[in-house]
Amino acid sequence: MTQSFIQNRKKWLIGLSIIVAFFSLAGYRYSKSHAQDDVLTIGISPPYAELLQSVADEVKKQGIQVKLVEFSDWHAPNVAVQNGDIDANFFQQSVFLSNAIRETNYDLHAFATGAGSHVGLYSKKYKSLDSLPTQARVVIPNDPVNSARALILLHRAGLIQLKDLNNELSTVQDIVSNPKQLQFIEVEGPHTAHAFNDADLIFGFPHYLKMAKVTDPHHAFFLTR
């Protein structure tokens, strides 16, 4: 068990404990679908399954059973909460949630935080960002929040320049300078890792890269939260 795993586990434990406390203090009553099992159902992303399962085992000591439901995309967990199929989800940034609510008018509320996810720039074909060719193909997520995170990281790496670095919803239309004429390919966030072997550069999430077994997640040109 690595130090990073232990530190993240503590952060997730705090977050899930807050979820448990929230439902308990609010006088949470299980619906008929939960009546027999007394289970608090929480939606998560696959890369965090092992970590969060260990946390759920700890939360069990507080008297509430936690069932983790894995979702392969980042849209379904919020839909599931909105529809009442699960009790909560635990996978997204506050900016991502705010944008989802703005786009869908879902009645969702944030009440717990956990460990933040690192993101980075990765390439199989090139050893440095300077060696990227003109019109290099760069794979970024297609959701507004993580697409902006990718562009901001590319700006900080000196590959492009954005109109406003503080705009958390920047799009490719906000690029004011692109010296290498980078070509952007947008895919669903969880799938950027699968483009590692073919693209010139990807904006990747270490947990997904590790799960896809395509590269060492620590071998990034830039790695940040």
Go through each PLM region and give its residues.
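Short, low-complexity disordered leader/linker segments with a strong preference
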Residues: M1-V39
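Immediate post-signal peptide segment of exported/extracytoplasmic ligand-binding proteins
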Residues: G27-T41, K60, L129-Q135
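Short, polar/charged alpha-helical segment
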Residues: V39, S45-E70, A76
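Short helix-initiation/N-cap motifs at beta->coil->alpha
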Residues: L68-V79, N166-H194
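Beta->alpha turn/N-cap motifs
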Residues: E70-W74, G84, A88-S98, E188-G189, ...
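Short beta-strand-centered segments that line the small-molecule binding cleft or hinge
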Residues: Q82, I86-N89, D107-T113
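Ligand-binding "clamshell"
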Residues: N99-F111, K124-Y126, D198, F203, ...
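A conserved helix-loop-strand patch within extracytoplasmic ligand-binding domains
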Residues: F111-Q161
